[in-house]
């Protein structure tokens, strides 16, 4: 069987370049001569390019599967969101290792119909409303949903237990003796289609639900904005200006927590001396923040890899839906007042 690395070796380019050329990635900046050389070598070795695959549609013998990745975020939003970009990275790594073609980014409300006609299946990243699910299912038989399970009787899904993971973080703060807790978080969004355009609706955020049920906070100590570093900075400044900071904060994303740390530092306040922090997601930057963050680690790359495996399993004939809930790990660092350790 001809592999991408065989073509790369003969063409004297990287495997990633070969994959993107054969996947007809128009955003790839490469000389026309190099592009044609890769295509010629692939055909010479008998590798099925996307163009060949299209011609063979409808024939009995099928080529390698072509997978689409549909994101509920815009390209700019996804680039700025380490959580979702890490899920995509896991998808791309698994596809690369299994030498499976994936399409360029498809975004809800902006995809072209002809792209869906070429796909064998799609992995959807993010929460989508029933109307958007119908739009997808009307065009594709096989879909796997990451971070959302819109129809457990029909579709595979991968996610985590947000409430349980949040309670573990909150209980950790209580176990350390903190009594007055505050919350900084964003608004959980569900994406849908209206007149062909992607729109977002605010829905219940399980992290906030867990916090309100567990901590019984003062209303002024619950600060809600958008999930971004800038908003974390703004909301912590607001908390500082109100006076009487809580003894500790549960912050619903590492990005927001990094912004919050900057606001505290500018105000001459120290973490955890003046207020402690536990955050959520476990992005790489959390370890290298000005005060290393105690955080709930979500295995986002593994979510992406699992999505590919489930979709391939479906394409190979499995009919019953499967739902995977991945575990999380509490990574304890200095921001909560402890020494570093992991708590599963």
From Swiss-Prot:
Cell compartment(s), UniProt: Cytoplasm
DNA-binding span(s): 4-23
Principal localisation: cytoplasm
SMART domains assigned: HTH_LACI
Any one GO molecular function term: DNA-binding transcription factor activity
Keywords: Cytoplasm, DNA-binding, Repressor, Transcription, Transcription regulation
GO cellular component term of the entry, any: cytoplasm
Pfam family, one: Peripla_BP_3
Function: Represses the melibiose operon melREDCA in the absence of melibiose or raffinose. Binds to two binding sites at the promoter region of the operon.
Name of the protein in question: HTH-type transcriptional repressor MelR
Natural source organism: Bacillus subtilis (strain 168)
Record lineage: Bacteria, Bacillati, Bacillota, Bacilli, Bacillales
